[in-house]
């Protein structure tokens, strides 16, 4: 708990003076005002995060948290639970979606076993930080204890801190865990006061009947556990997931270290809701990636108050959307660093 508290204490507001200078520079680059749209806003945000009008994000990593979910036994997923461990090992082989997309920007993919149901070979290349062998069935009781949730948050903090110590300047969040759209929808239902029926989607290939069953399970989990919407730790402990808490920890660590962090899709946005509930200033360090095809995604991004960068009907997870947006973040840096102002170019208008 001390690590979590200290991390939260370190999170500061963005540097407004640097942002003002960055805005003035962007407004005077050799182009019509606002002609590069949200790329200009992103450059200003990066300046405020890094305290320089010449931000760089050369060293990039996506931390992929992997864990299983006890609620799987309620029939809420369209794929076998074994996919979690198979895909977790595939991250090491470099053959998953996020690995392929990450190659575009030279991004390091870091898979972390924070709660996979099976034991993984410690020499396989996955970072072993297992809290427990998957969550408990939240339809019958808490997904995990409060202490386990705090520990999962702190695992995310520790992994992110290590990568930042090693020189990473841009982080992304990813996940792997069959059943985690159920946990994410439960979190969103609690924090946004939504009826699960309104925001429950197909996840990994559910039928219409399966979606109805999933919504009913989520409603039952909330009724059984009565999570406190004003306490993010209580919410993620009772109806969340280990990988969701881990991603929230990554976001908190990024903010504490003044490192931009790209939020992937629906599950990562649920993690962002937890992180921001623990420290609202964390939101200023988040860079949204894509509008997920998952039905609750729009509600989640609206509740968080972020606007996705791209709309491509993605719903893979893994950090795949973050990987696609990394080049956009780099482009924002190149724009403010490589384009001259009218004065620098000797142009009078």
Curated annotation (Swiss-Prot):
UniProt pathway: Nucleoside biosynthesis; alpha-ribazole biosynthesis; alpha-ribazole from 5,6-dimethylbenzimidazole: step 1/2
Transmembrane regions listed in the UniProt entry: none
InterPro entries xrefs: Nict_dMeBzImd_PRibTrfase (IPR003200), Nict_dMeBzImd_PRibTrfase_bact (IPR017846), Nict_dMeBzImd_PRibTrfase_N (IPR023195), Nict_dMeBzImd_PRibTrfase_sf (IPR036087)
Gene3D superfamilies for the chain: 1.10.1610.10, 3.40.50.10210
EC annotation from Swiss-Prot or TrEMBL: 2.4.2.21
Residue numbers annotated as active site: 318 (proton acceptor)
Protein name per its UniProtKB record: Nicotinate-nucleotide--dimethylbenzimidazole phosphoribosyltransferase
Origin organism lineage: Bacteria, Bacillati, Bacillota, Clostridia, Peptostreptococcales
């Amino acid at each position: 708990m001390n690590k979590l508290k200290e991390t939260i204490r370190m999170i500061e507001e963005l540097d407004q003076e640097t942002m003002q200078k960055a805005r003035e520079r962007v407004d005077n680059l050799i182009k019509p005002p606002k002609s590069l749209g949200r790329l200009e806003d992103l450059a200003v945000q990066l300046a405020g995060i890094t305290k320089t009008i010449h931000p760089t994000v050369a060293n990039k990593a996506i931390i992929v948290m992997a864990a299983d979910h006890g609620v799987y036994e309620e029939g809420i997923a369209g794929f076998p639970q074994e996919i979690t461990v198979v895909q977790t090992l595939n991250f090491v082989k470099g053959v998953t979606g996020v690995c392929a997309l990450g190659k575009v920007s030279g991004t390091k993919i870091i898979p972390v076993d924070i709660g996979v149901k099976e034991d993984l070979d410690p020499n396989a290349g996955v970072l072993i930080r297992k809290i427990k062998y998957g969550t408990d069935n939240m339809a019958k009781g808490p997904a995990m204890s409060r202490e386990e949730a705090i520990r999962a948050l702190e695992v995310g903090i520790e992994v992110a801190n290590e990568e930042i110590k090693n020189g990473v300047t841009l982080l992304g969040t990813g996940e792997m865990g069959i059943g985690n759209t159920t946990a994410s929808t439960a979190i969103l239902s609690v924090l946004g006061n939504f009826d699960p029926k309104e925001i429950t989607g197909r996840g990994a290939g559910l039928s219409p009947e399966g979606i109805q069953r999933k919504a009913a399970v989520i409603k039952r989990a909330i009724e059984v556990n009565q999570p406190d919407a004003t306490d993010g730790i209580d919410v993620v402990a009772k109806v969340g997931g280990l990988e969701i808490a881990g991603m929230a920890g990554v976001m908190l660590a990024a903010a504490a270290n003044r490192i931009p962090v790209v939020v992937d899709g629906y599950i990562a946005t649920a993690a962002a809701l937890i992180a921001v509930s623990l420290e609202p200033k964390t939101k200023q360090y988040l860079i949204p990636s894509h509008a997920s095809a998952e039905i609750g995604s729009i509600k989640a991004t609206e509740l968080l108050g972020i606007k996705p960068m791209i709309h491509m009907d993605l719903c893979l997870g893994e950090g795949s959307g973050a990987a696609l947006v990394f080049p956009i973040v780099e482009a924002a840096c190149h724009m403010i660093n490589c384009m001259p102002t009218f004065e620098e170019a000797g142009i009078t208008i």
